[in-house]
Amino acid sequence: MATTHNLGFPRIGGQRELKFALEDYWGGRQTEQELAITAADLRLRHWQQQAGLDYVPVGDFSLYDQVLDMSVTLGNLPIRAASKEGSELDAYFRAARGRGANDSPCCATAAGEMTKWFDTNYHYIVPELTADTHFELNPERLLTQLSEARKQGLNAKPVIIGPVTYLWLGKTSDASNRLDLLERLLPVYSQLLEALADAGAEWVQLDEPALVTDLDANWRYAFNLAYHQLKANRPKLLLATYFGELRDNLQLACELPVAGLHIDAISAPAEVSRVADWLPSHKVLSLGVVNGRNIWKSDLNSTLGWLEPLNEKLGQRLWLAPSCSLLHAPVDLSREQELDSDIRNWLAFAVQKLDELQILARALNEGRSSVRAELADNQLAIDSRRNSHRVTNPEVRKAVASVTPELGNRHSPYPQRIARQRERLNLPAFPTTTIGSFPQTREIRQARLQFRKGELSEQAYIEQMRAEIVRCVEAQEKLGLDVLVHGEPERNDMVEYFGEQLDGYAFTRFGWVQSYGSRCVKPPILFGDIRRPQAMTVEWIRYAQSLTDKPVKGMLTGPVTILNWSFVRDDQPRKDSCLQLALAIREEVQDLEKAGVNIIQIDEAALREGLPLRQSDWATYLEWAINSFRIAANGVDDSTQIHTHMCYSEFNDIIEAIARMDADVITIETSRSDMELLDAFRSFEYPNDIGPGVYDIHSPNIPDKEHIINLMTLAAERIPAERLWINPDCGLKTRKWEEVTPALETMVAAARELRS
């Protein structure tokens, strides 16, 4: 009798209700009580959408981030966030974004460091640890949500981050060993599990995705120590792994003293039979059989083909779930009435994935005949996609076949190129620039919406966007920036904007997923071969350049980032789709150069998040990813300067690979980690120009001039000053003009002082 459960559900709401409630609260337009009501309503609705499952997750809902929630539960908020006046919620948001709803800009504090959640586009707030970190249980959030769910008659399964992964995700600021804190942490976990059991929890899910990464003997010992100590607690423990294969941690995971183990059967299909054989006969095996990270329908008949023998073997010990939390999937496909009907029929969002789960369970428990119609409909959809003429393009296939290694090479090495570029551009020392986007005001968003609805003519839309470009260029000239951008008012998203102009992409209206906090993205759907029918950005950049004598950067998103921030077809290797994207971007780069654009930025913000979780797999990924970037970037003259930008990543371990990209200038996010990236330059001499981000745009805080000068002075100890640029650490799209202007004034003032 297969049991169904879920590891987590999207928290933002089908219409992004959480996003808007948070922003209203931060903006003083909503009270803390009103925010709490919205959150409770969303939780109730999400539980109702999961009510057909045998176990429903509790604690997966968060106002900002589940890792930050765990820090709160463990009493591990940074002192700087918790020591000021205000509510617990104010302290929570200070840790997340540097400012509570009731804090003034002058009283803001440093936001917590934010980085990518494993190899996804979700960001978490890094737990801050020192040798003196003290943990203290604060279970109210979890207990409240558990009580709410039980009142609805639901079989609730609390979800928490396991103790070893929590420490693994953290970072120490004093060179101490994170694992030294484990013995101090485990009693708090024991108290939490006991409290959840007292509140009626039969099962508790402990997420330990660190088990799918490379672990040394100390971390493996930590798992044994932790779970042998926690096994005495009353609730049954379901240890959840996801995003990859267990590999050399498989035996460890199977032998830990827990009541059940969840593995990702989508990412690690070859391990299913091994785990089933290894797992002791008293333990539950939960299989992630529906892809929680993509939007394609599952092939249910194929899945049943390998599940049915396991069901015979395991019986009641078999649980079924999505591969990971559905946090990474849009909420509900049923609202996508404008989506092409053929493509819509190929898709499943979070709600539909749970339907698939229940069809599989019924087929196992009652026989395939009990879901004959559902399986037949599913097979029709699978066959439709497999046989569709819309998926392949012979012209694209021919272009890919003609690619040669020479396409990835510039004419000359960097020293010769940079000499020509400096002569052409004539920029001052420590040149200042921004990363690309400027604030997307209400007026910009409204114009884009009206244009999409047909309420605004194309000419009127172009005129309004041009007016915004004028505003942006004039503002940058007034600020004294050296290299300008057009501000990207016409772009809804740095990936979707390009996808909308490429053959092989489809788009949703409501396919939002959370990136961090209130920030949501709507990944386009890469369903077929990629072709660029016409130029995508040239006219906007040409217009911006006509307004100023200063250089204006052409702004493109790179092939690897477009790939990693899309929902990607799963019927061919990702590297094949990436190469198709690279050829399309290469055409755009060449058109920009022909239009007289002297600096072209190709953002690869998501390069690192595509890295496999196991270091032994990195070389293969980096080879095709960097090759794709080089093919996109290197079809230009030596005097054309190629920039790239990367964000929210740690690069020290791939700095040599980044150097192989051979961009003339790279700008990177370093402000939240206090230039930690520069540690890489102790042992590696980065050969090209670099702009280490000097202030954090994800926080509303205004940077301090002396802090910027100190950061750049530190950078100049590692990199020759003549190769340093000064810039924010990311685009300014999500900020307000009243935040952007003083921040950039400070940045330019710092640059001028450094020059003097």
From Swiss-Prot:
Cofactor note: Binds 1 zinc ion per subunit.
InterPro entries membership: Cbl-indep_Met_Synth_N, Cobalamin-indep_Met_synthase, Met_Synth_C/arc, UROD/MetE-like_sf
SUPFAM superfamilies linked to this entry: UROD/MetE-like
Keywords noted in UniProt: Amino-acid biosynthesis, Metal-binding, Methionine biosynthesis, Methyltransferase, Repeat, Transferase, Zinc
GO biological process terms, semicolon-separated: methionine biosynthetic process; methylation
Residues noted as binding L-homocysteine in the record, renumbered to the chain: 435-437, 488, 603
EC number(s) from the headed UniProt entry: 2.1.1.14
Enzyme class (EC, first level): transferase
Cofactor: Zn(2+)
Reaction it catalyzes: 5-methyltetrahydropteroyltri-L-glutamate + L-homocysteine = tetrahydropteroyltri-L-glutamate + L-methionine
Binding site for Zn(2+): 645, 647, 669, 730
Family, per entry: Belongs to the vitamin-B12 independent methionine synthase family.
Protein name: 5-methyltetrahydropteroyltriglutamate--homocysteine methyltransferase
Gene, per the UniProt record: metE
